[in-house]
């Protein structure tokens, strides 16, 4: 009988089916990509548009779930045995690595979307074996279904792991709804090899194509004590969460490693004390795995065959599991009680002198000199080992600032436990945004500064009669309405859908650091705020019925009033929706350093860019639009509207393609697409001049963030809709809808459902 053959032969990634072949990005790698504006919509969500995760979570039998998770910790499975009979260390690492991708500059990364399930994170070298952790969790996820997301479950499991080993956690908040596709918006770096860092650092390491170990670059780099990490990255190597545990580029120098630790943890919003607490606390538990060289480790999950069913890194050494496990390539157990909370990590750190050695996989690590064999083996009860440490562990002793904190924690175990509990909570909740999003019975009562607290509403809210009167008062102040639009936009557009920070609520635009940001044009901002504070003061003083208006509400209302006036002047009267309920935060409730990372380096909506920006304005525009949860049509209509409303940050005429600035017309699109205008690039390729094709008379000036709507084929297609003879009404309506969306992105108090404004 002839041999049976599978009819579907592998054709690689470029097969002759839909999505295969040579793609646009192959022909034009620098083409502006709009795909990040089309992600995470209801189309990709199998639970449907009406699914309300918050409501589902609130029906969860939370105590039963925690009991099941606690039981799992010691239910060792033959297919992936538990170190020391306890999965605690593995699940702490899973939760840490889910949350630890967060970075302060753009708020991307973090645990909030459950992205560890998808590429590239599911295949990063730093996440070896976490595929097994999630599979161990699957029966519990399967049992509780939609009531607990993967994003929440991974973090809660880390908490339960800590509690099951005797540690008292600070609390837990649910509310992380899953996404259903890989997030394409995060910039993870430009390196094309695992563990490379030659793009993020001026003198870095080229990386490797090997899996399952941290590769050491034996070259001595003098810059490792002071090198600058590319923004917005918060990891020292492609495919690592933070730093190379062997030391910078694999060089076992604890002092140089401290520099990388301080930078990477700082970019994850952690100060020195939180950093020491996290490293020392996390390394109280479990072990690392480096039983043999990385040559024994197979393909990562995304490269493995179908038969692997999403698992990767098949290990050919011995049994490939248990005592034969290869994960980081390091073989370190820090304490003699790796399944119990203790102070032993810090005790051993200072008790012993340490000498450099190598793991069975060939990775640099450290062993205690002249120490007894006191560390248990993970699988052989009759076997003991000498204490071992990572290069980055020793940084806590040999960096002067870290040492001071470490010794204080050593002498004050209660301080250490409290610091670790708080730092762990911050690590795992940093990207959740305000407390209004927190769900569940273990939400801590203490309000923390990094949560950007806003006072609860403590007065009666204004009604439609009041809003109408306030709008009249605002427009009667004599301030150019464009400045009210600019102020409202400046306040609301600080929102980041990535970590749910920013927005108009709190009126923090009147405080440091936002009030002095160049993009906010402080003189104009102050003029607008002073006028609004006067309106607010007069209104609040005149009300005997406890009705008050917050400045945060008034900033948004003033912008809405100005937009309505501009639409009326265009001949299309419209009502801009407004919902009161915002409150005013104080300067003391504003973490200045934390908010300083949110200052835009470019904002195409206001034609702003810092002089040292290396990227193209149109790319930064799309980046900003994605953070605002905007679609391509929403981005398009907002830019076109803001230009004719004359809201450029510096009052320039770039992109103001109209003879009637301040009127909400579709002139931007009409004039941009006018073939009677010929464009010429300036000397720097950032500013352009448009002249009449026949006479050569200068007509307009523009930036890249303006002309992209006529240059980019997909954006031009949208622009044509608004430039059409019947497009004015649609333009006004769509602008108002998109404006309202941005003004309310941070109104989680209104979002009883898992709320996402519809995209145009």
Curated annotation (Swiss-Prot):
PANTHER family: CATALASE-PEROXIDASE (PTHR30555:SF0), HYDROPEROXIDASE I, BIFUNCTIONAL CATALASE-PEROXIDASE (PTHR30555)
Cofactor remark from the record: Binds 1 heme b (iron(II)-protoporphyrin IX) group per monomer.
Name of the protein this chain belongs to: Catalase-peroxidase
Region described as Disordered: 1-24
Function: Bifunctional enzyme with both catalase and broad-spectrum peroxidase activity.
Positions bearing the Tryptophyl-tyrosyl-methioninium (Tyr-Met) (with W-96) cross-link: 242-268
MF terms in GO: catalase activity; heme binding; metal ion binding
Main subcellular location of this protein, as a coarse class: cytoplasm
Catalytic residue list: 97
Main enzyme class: oxidoreductase
Organism for this UniProt entry: Aspergillus clavatus (strain ATCC 1007 / CBS 513.65 / DSM 816 / NCTC 3887 / NRRL 1 / QM 1276 / 107)
Chain positions recorded as heme b binding sites: 283
PROSITE patterns with a match to the protein in the record: PEROXIDASE_1 (PS00435), PEROXIDASE_2 (PS00436), PEROXIDASE_4 (PS50873)
Site (Transition state stabilizer) residue list: 93
